[in-house]
Amino acid sequence: MVAEDAAGIGTNKIGALAALGYDYAELLLCGLAKLPEEAFWQVQNELTQSGLRCEACNGFFPTDFRLTGPDIKKDQIREYIARALDRAGALGVERVVFGSGPAKSVPSGFPVSEGWKQVAEMLHDAGEIARQYQILIAIEPLRRQESNFINTYQEGCRLAKDVAHPNVKSLVDFYHLVEEQ
């Protein structure tokens, strides 16, 4: 689906997807999270009227967010996660994909091991919030052209194991898997 709406969410395609017989829509969570309340409820109404569910969301974090490095803002991250997952919960989302390449990339000169700890802690906190909505967070390893961090399925599995939260797992995207071989 190519998003043509102002927020880049793809809501302009909901009616067409329903008419074509699609089972569900996968929307951009960072776009949903930044919508004003009224615009968000319009998205929910469009989904309801179309009969289409939003079972999954991609784009957990916006590209300008920093999840690793010396200047992360933990309070801002927690507030964002709470808002984003609240929105996902209101739509009945079951899975949120954490690829978020630019947001998770480790800044040059910053220890990767420290970035790993930061992301693991953040995902554990996110898992606690996700549990309230019965949402599963799926770690998506991305090819190196999109991020310098969590690039292989093995790394995604290791991160999920380190997070040790039942609402945080790893997924494999065939495209990224093949690109990293």
Question: What is each residue range found by the language model?
Answer:
Residues 90-109, 133-143:
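Active-site groove signature of glycoside hydrolases
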Residues 2-3, 29-31, 60-63, 102-104, ...:
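Active-site-proximal loop/turn and secondary-structure-junction residues that shape catalytic pockets
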Residues 68-72, 107-116:
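Glycine-rich tight-turn/loop motif centered on a GG-T
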Residues 9, 35, 107, 147-148, ...:
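Secondary-structure boundary/capping motif
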Residues 9, 39, 111, 149-155:
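Residues at alpha-helix caps and immediate loop-helix transition turns in enzyme cores, especially N-
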Residues 1-93, 124, 161, 165:
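N-terminal pre-domain/capping segments
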Residues 24-25, 57, 120-181:
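Acidic/histidine-rich catalytic cores of soluble enzymes
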